[in-house]
Each structure stands twice: as C-alpha cells, then as structure tokens.
Amino acid sequence: MPHSDELDSRDVLSVSGLNIAFHHEGQQVDAVRNVSLRLKRGETLAIVGESGSGKSVTALALMRLIEQSGANVRCGEMLLRRRNRQVIELSEQSDAQMRRVRGADIAMIFQEPMTSLNPVFTVGEQIAESIRLHQGASHEEALAEAKRMLDQVRIPESQAILSRYPHQLSGGMRQRVMIAMALSCRPAVLIADEPTTALDVTIQAQILQLIKVLQQEMSMGVIFITHDMGVVADIADRVLVMYQGEAVETGSVEQIFHAPTHPYTQTLLAAVPQLGAMRGHSLPRRFPLISADEPALYESQIEQDTVVEGEPILQVRGLVTRFPLRSGLFNRVTREVHAVENISFDLWPGETLSLVGESGSGKSTTGRALLRLVESRQGEIIFNGQRIDTLSAGKLQPLRRDIQCIFQDPYASLDPRQTVGYSIMEPLRIHGLGQGDAAAKRVAWLLERVGLRPEHAWRYPHEFSGGQRQRICIARALALNPKVIIADEAVSALDVSVRGQIINLLLDLQREMGIAYLFISHDMAVVERISHRVAVMYLGQIVEMGPRRAVFENPQHPYTRKLMAAVPVADPSRHRPRRVLLSDDIPSNIHKRGEETPAVSLQLVGPGHYVARPLQDNALSRL
C-alpha cells in the first residue's frame, strides 16, 4: 500500500500515535502510550530516558522485533522511506519482507554485543553475511568490505580480527564489530540503542564522529537511544524525552538543555555527573541525588577520609599477563597478547584506587589476575602480607573470602534458575559460615543494607531492574565481609540516577566497613567522584598514577590528557567547538612469541604522583 503522500519529502521515518502492550498473566500491560516522532534525512534524534521509560521498546517496534518479546503494537502508524524512495508502513510488512528491509533500509546497533553476535561464527563471516545478503557481493568482496568497515571503526589488526570469534574480543571491540556490521549496508535509518555505553571515552568519541561522518555521506537518519546526556549534547539535533512510556518533552537539543520545561527532563539533566565537579576536593563525595517529584531536593554531602594508614592490604609488583595466539597447521603458539606488562601498585584499607583506560588497556585483565581467574606470567600479588599468586587452589580458597568482585553485567552474574536469596547465601554455604535461620537472617540484613527488602530474597533475577540486580550483586559480594572488592565496570551500563545511587551505596559501605575498592572503569566523571587515587593504563602499562585530585586537575601524561579531552560535556553550546576528536591508530598489543614490550619507568612529579617517561621506541612516545 503506497504512503508517499503521508510522508514529508525530507522525512525518512514518521511515527504517529504508537501504542505498545505486553502480555502478562492474561492481561495487556501498556509499555508505550501515544508516542509520535519524525526523523529527517541526515538528522539525529536522541531518545532519552531511564530504564523502563519505553525508549528501547519503541526502537524494537520500528525493527518489527517486538513480537519476539511477547508484545504487540496495539495502534499507531510507522512509515519508512526506503533507499529506493518507496514509502512503506512497517506494521503491514510480512516477516519475509522485513528481512529484506532490516539491514538494507533500517538497521540497529544493540547495547549488548555478546548477545547480538553469533558465538559459533567468526567476526568476518558475520559482517560479510549481511553484505552478501543485501548487496549481492561475492564472498571475497564481502570479506574485503568487512575488513574496510573494521578499519573505519578503528579496530587494530583488522585482518586478524576477521578470523576471530566474539568471545576472543573485549567488550569494546565487540561493540565496534556490531557498529561495523550495522553500517556495512548503509541503511536509510540507523537506530543506535546505547551503542557507546560499554565503550571507553576515546573510542566513544571516535564512534560518535564515525556515525556523524557516515550520516553526512549517506544522508542517513539516526535515532540515538541513550541515558548519557553528554553524548546527547554531542550528537543530537533534536531530543525526545520519554518517561513511563510517554513522550513528555521534545525539542531541539539547545531547547532541551537550556530551557527544559518538564520536571523529569530537569531531573535527568541535574543527575548528570560533570567532569571537573570535584575540583578543589581531595576526598570522594556522594552524588547529589534528586527525584522527579522533588527536583530541588538534594542529598547532603558527606566527606570523610576512610583510608587507613599503615601497611597496604594489597600489593602488586611487576605483574605480567599474556595470552597465547595459535595458528598454522600444527596450531602452535606464534604470537601473544601482552595484556598486562610489568605493573605495580598498592591498595590501602578503606581506599579506592581506580584503574582507567581504553578497551584493551589491560585494566579488566589486571582485576582478573588479582582474583586468580587468569594466571600471570610473572610478578607478585601480596594480600594482607601473604603472597597469593603462587598458592594452590586449595590454599587460595580461604583467602577468597576477603577478595570479592562485582562485574559489569549483573544479569550474567546471577543464576537465572535460583532465587536471589539463594545466590546471596551461596558464598556463606561454600565457606561454611552459616546455614538455616542464621544464613537467612544474614541474607535479609544484606538486602536491607543495599536498599532492598528482605522479601525480595524469594524472587528471581529477571524480576528486578538493572540497578536492583547490581545491588543484589553487591549484597552477594558483601556476604563474607571482604576486605577488598574489585568492581569491574560495575556501574557503566546503569542509568545516571541509578549509577549515582550505586556509587553512594559503595561509598557508604566503605565508610562503615573500611572496604578497599579497586574500581575499574572508563567513565571519567564517575572515577573522579569515587576515587582516592587513579592509575591510568595504556597497552597494558601504567602511564600515570597518583592522587585523584592531582591526576584530574594536573594531568601530566599526554594519554591522560586525551582521555580527559574525550569526555562528553552535557552542554551543546560549550561542547561542540572545543571537542577533541582522536584520529590516531591504536597500536596493537599483539607481539611475536618471545618479543618483549619496551618498559616504561614511572617518575615522581609531585606528592604521590607518578608519570611514565617512555623510551624512544615505545608506542607511548608517539602520543
């Protein structure tokens, strides 16, 4: 059925009166109510809102994937102008017709790449499949185009990456593969659902730049779904704010940021962590939390030095971690990934040391090495005066009580078949620290301590929001009264207000229990808020380390300054002219077997402030 008269000549997408409902226990539950939007060629529309606001559900409806989630479009119109200028009503298309439309005319980048990529096919085959299907290219032509797209999204060693599987890549690398796949067929409309949430700030800056460049080249309309208002300020032309399934405010990016009218929009903007907000403060500070009902209500600020002087609780000396890469007829080790190269640091009781850096910098591998989830090539890990890197699994078991972890994805960290009470109680049973009523009381206390109710113990993970699931993971980590918690991107995927709540909870627990945190993150504004000290990692090495105030207010290493410059600022008028976009290639940390990485020496430049002075042939010297 033709619809060309109903769509403006410049519009590529028009949605009117969209209503979406989920089926739950025999009833219809409205998820989206009366949402309307328009998207022009070459325009970027940002849809913002917290979890549960309906923004992702709206995107899935446009892709006609919502039916797979047990939902349906109750009413509304969704018109799309295809690349061949034909206008179609998306809800009228058959499944076979939609398979031809998806990818070629409307494409989507999802937030979680590991669940979007097929684990049994190589990266190259998955990108090439889309190119062959929609462009009619040969296998060789499709692989060549796949390599070119990987180069465009700034993946080093792109030829080698083509033959790797998703699990062999870091989270940031997998997200870049997803972006390359979505853009490979140059769609008329690109829907990006939190595409940069899992990426570090420098890669985020380049991905945003890449999307803008390709958008201009192809006159592509972009719907950018995010909760990061800094990203919105950087990329959006217009903004649609969603709250509880409804569009509560829409306007140009300047109108939304400088003259928001709805209380919820004002709440979103006030909750954004601002880099530089800690200037003049040496100690971590709680986030000022506000509510949509009372936008003027701020929590009080509490500053307290929690660091205990004396001996460090954790010492790392000369840690080296490498991963073998096999190739050839006999599957021999020919190259190695130099993930962590000769790093050393200390962590004191009650202190938060943050590890920051790009994807592939080695920060997560460092955390896993400390937990003995990966084995180190050399170096020493000393916990509470005892060397633990040489202990057997049996002797290490009692020490695991004192070192716990919180991972990025709380849903993947919890057993979906068990109640959350069972998951929280499990460490107590393993270590023989409680059973029966005593363990149940401990679980109830832990749930209350992280802001949940004791009766939540009988629920399953899927019955909670992302922020609630992360609180459950924190409760589980606290079950054994640990001395150190390694938090690996623990808040990066959470909404801004939920992120602030979790950070405040971690600070409260540190103040009450004296816990030391190794906080691994790429979110510089959050790192600035929670840290006592910061260590900046680049290609497996620490290039700058010192008190948080010194590193953030007076960064000495060029790589640290690049990280700072790449942080999005939630102000479109200030931000666009001063934006620093990086174009340097990331050197590869893959080396021939037996090849050594040139060492760097850390030199003292201020009280407790160290910066790397690279050797002339080191990649650091090119920054």
Swiss-Prot record:
Q: Which GO terms describe its molecular function?
A: ATP binding; ATP hydrolysis activity
Q: Keywords for this entry?
A: ATP-binding, Cell inner membrane, Cell membrane, Hydrolase, Membrane, Nucleotide-binding, Repeat, Translocase, Transport
Q: Which GO terms describe its biological process?
A: peptide transport; transmembrane transport
**PROSITE patterns, from UniProt?**
ABC_TRANSPORTER_1 (PS00211), ABC_TRANSPORTER_2 (PS50893)
Q: Which domain of life is it from?
A: Bacteria
The answer to whether keyword Cytoplasm applies is no
Task: Please identify the protein, giving its name as recorded.
Answer: Glutathione import ATP-binding protein GsiA
Q: Which intervals of the chain form a coiled coil?
A: none
- Catalysed reaction per UniProt? glutathione(out) + ATP + H2O = glutathione(in) + ADP + phosphate + H(+)
Query: What is the recorded function of this protein according to its Swiss-Prot or TrEMBL entry?
Result: Part of the ABC transporter complex GsiABCD involved in glutathione import. Responsible for energy coupling to the transport system.
User: Where in the cell does this protein reside?
Assistant: Cell inner membrane
Pfam families per UniProt? ABC_tran (PF00005), oligo_HPY (PF08352)
Matches recorded under CDD domains: ABC_NikE_OppD_transporters (cd03257)
Residues covered by the ABC transporter domain = 15-269, 325-564
